[in-house]
Amino acid sequence: MAVYTDVSDEALRAFLQEYELGELLSYKGIAEGVENSNFYLHTSTGHYILTLYEKRVSEADLPFFINLMGHLARAGLACPQPVRNRAGTALGRLCGRPAAIVTFLEGVSLSRPNAEHCRALGAALAGLHAAGRDFPMVRENNLSVGAWRPLFAQAEAQADTVAPGLAARTRADLDILEGAWPKDLPGGVIHADLFTDNVFFIGDAVSGLIDFYFACTDAFAYDLAISLNAWCFDADGTFHRDKAGAMLAGYDAVRTLEPAEIAAIPVLARGAAMRFMLTRLVDWLNVPPGALVQPKDPLEYDRRLAFHRTAADARDYGWEG
């Protein structure tokens, strides 16, 4: 989450006239993240999140995201529910951007999750995959393996200014990943961005999953690999095998992983690290001037890739099934 588009008090109050949310009491921009402009809203009826969708999010994809959140919430998953306006729609326009309001979830995100938090996250992710199985809409993952080389082309000329040798390492990894990427794994709706700041806890229990704006249709195990990268490494590249093993076990306890998925964990984890290294690299080199935004360090994922190059099989990720 971030703020790229400033919203005036006058514009927001006019927008809220389209909703039955009572009187606006306060609002505040959310600086975390890098994708959309987000604001906490406090009205006389409660707390909400307002999102203005920025250029990376295609307006054509918004019905998928909005309908998915509604579907998952109805299936019992703790996630934001879109708020419909007086016309019965969940999408509007504010300051020239598509905009939506969703419900606020209680809980806190964890900057240093332990192994039991990772186990709970694995179970919650499996629950998300189960809840989305009968969702009728499909959205291709436009940040999967076929997109990585074009992404790299946007940053290749400057990559070695970020870290010496980064361009050559990336080219070599892409050659391997493009040749080894698995096909025909079990799949359906995935979150595709389930980092620690997109999961809320109350105590040791998951209380909510948020930020579904990369959700798409892809392999379930790839979603798990994204979270392995996000939850089980330190910023310096240190891998915590106990956390990864707990996450895999927590997932498998809810939805049994198939042998092909288990065998694919090393290449999926390597690919997931590549995806986030590349998008971070492009963002790092292209931060809009004046934006209230904190660009993410691409080298955190370059360091994760160094680990993935050494992994032989799922046991290196703590799998004990």
From Swiss-Prot:
PANTHER family in UniProt: AMINOGLYCOSIDE PHOSPHOTRANSFERASE DOMAIN-CONTAINING PROTEIN, AMINOGLYCOSIDE PHOSPHOTRANSFERASE DOMAIN-CONTAINING PROTEIN-RELATED
InterPro entries associated with the record: Aminoglycoside_PTrfase (IPR002575), Homoserine_kinase_II (IPR005280), Kinase-like_dom_sf (IPR011009), Pseudomonas-type_ThrB (IPR050249)
HAMAP family xrefs: Homoser_kinase_2
Pathway: Amino-acid biosynthesis; L-threonine biosynthesis; L-threonine from L-aspartate: step 4/5
Lineage: Bacteria, Pseudomonadati, Pseudomonadota, Alphaproteobacteria, Hyphomicrobiales
Catalytic activity reported: L-homoserine + ATP = O-phospho-L-homoserine + ADP + H(+)
SUPFAM superfamilies: Protein kinase-like (PK-like)
MF (Gene Ontology): ATP binding; homoserine kinase activity
Name assigned to this protein: Homoserine kinase
GO BP: threonine biosynthetic process
Family designation: Belongs to the pseudomonas-type ThrB family.
Pfam families registered for this protein in UniProt: APH
